[in-house]
Amino acid sequence: KGCDFMEKYRVKPLKPAANMEISVPGSKSITNRALLMAALSDGRVCLKGVLFSDDSRYFLKALEELGFKLQIDEEKKEVTVTGEGGMIPEKSGEIYVGSAGTAARFLTAMLGLSGGTYTIQASEQMKKRPMKALFQALEQLGVHFDYLENEYFLPVRTLGKEAGKNRVTLDISQTSQPLSALLMASVMCNDGISIDITSEKKQGTYIEITRKMMQTFG
């Protein structure tokens, strides 16, 4: 099933006419969102048109380290993920996200809200990138962290989650990825999550992509 969340463009016919086949590359942002949603789904999900990049490979490796069953075919650009209904097979472990911002933020939200104990390592570049908005939001939701080097930066260890906290305020002025991360990972919370966006920026293309993809996944 397709996702109607991208802008539409008018394409003029090629003159003279020619018979050809064009392969359009996938999207890093869409690929990593789809991987997270597939992992949080219940049952097998086959993703087609996957973009294999450093970011998606770090994401795939992390899912394998967390115990998810994957079938990967780079030639066909396909990945099959067996979701565990919002559960993570391994209740503790360590992953490495390299310099992948989407993997870092999406997986941090998932691991934090799971209530397990996980260590999230990253490249020196990723250790300098802003994560404070996401960490503070997760702390409001009862997630406890051990910041291994600098507060509100990777690397970090999740130390479990308090029950009963489901309201959060969030500033997305720097990046909307924390909002996308919370929206997707909210399926792990029995009562859902109530998010109050405090920044002037409240909408954006990537937020809409996340919302439309979540609708597609049901």
Residue ranges and their predicted role:
Residues 5-218:
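Structural preference for solvent-exposed beta-strand-turn elements
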